[in-house]
Amino acid sequence: VEKNNLSKLNFNNPDNIVGTVDMPTECGTVIRKGKSYSQNAEIIDLLHAAGAIVMGKTATSELAYLGPSKTTNPHDYSRTPGGSSSGSAASVASLMAPLSIGSQTGGSVIRPASYCGVVGYKPSYGLISRNGVLRTSNTLDHIGMFGRTVEDVPLLAKVLIKKDNYDPATVYYSAENILNETKKGPLFEPKFIFYKTDHWKIIDKKS
């Protein structure tokens, strides 16, 4: 991936979130079948301006919530890719695209990234515009992204992190050095925590 632009890079974005003029935005539900927008979401325009090619929409959980999407895990078709940005993570894991867009209110970027074995990045609140994006929670919704490497993801973040007057939650932040920041290592010593949820007693041994 070139350092200064996204020229001719293929991208996918999840059907649930990103409004587009040239493709339907159905939010993973039949009640919005064929629904299209009169203008692109802000992040789509930023991608186009950077030279990216948006290849298509990926499957998502219905209304970006709990129901499973049509997508399966590319490493094991019998398993889930995680949600709600399931298709976005799976498309990167299956080499359909080098980078992909996702959204997160709870764990909808970091979960499918973990399940599919790709890099998931959920920037801090207010760094990326949600203008033209399906809202689940105004105070919790984030735009995130998926990539194959830690080095690739900041190149996309650098393009999308912009102040947008149509999303009052966004703030000005210079992302010029974001790639260098990823090379510095963690600010604190990482800790690994293993937590048994209430579902632990019913999970199968293979899982």
Predicted regions: what is each one?
Residues V1-G106:
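Gly/Ser-rich catalytic/binding loops embedded in alpha/beta enzyme cores
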Residues E2, V92-A93, R111, G120-K122, ...:
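Short beta-strand-to-turn element immediately C-terminal to the catalytic PLP-Schiff-base lysine
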Residues T20, E62-A64, G107-I110, H142, ...:
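Flexible loop/turn segments at secondary-structure boundaries
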Residues M23-T25, Y65-P68, I110-Y115, G132-V133, ...:
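Short acidic, glycine/serine/threonine-rich loops at helix termini
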Residues K35-S36, S78-G82, I110, L134-T136, ...:
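Short Gly/Pro-enriched turn/cap motifs at secondary-structure boundaries
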Residues H48, A89-A93, C116, K122, ...:
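Predominant activation on well-ordered alpha-helical scaffold segments within soluble catalytic domains
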Residues T105-N131:
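Glycine/threonine-rich beta-strand-loop-alpha-helix active-site module
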Residues K122-K206:
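A short helix-breaking turn/cap at a secondary-structure junction
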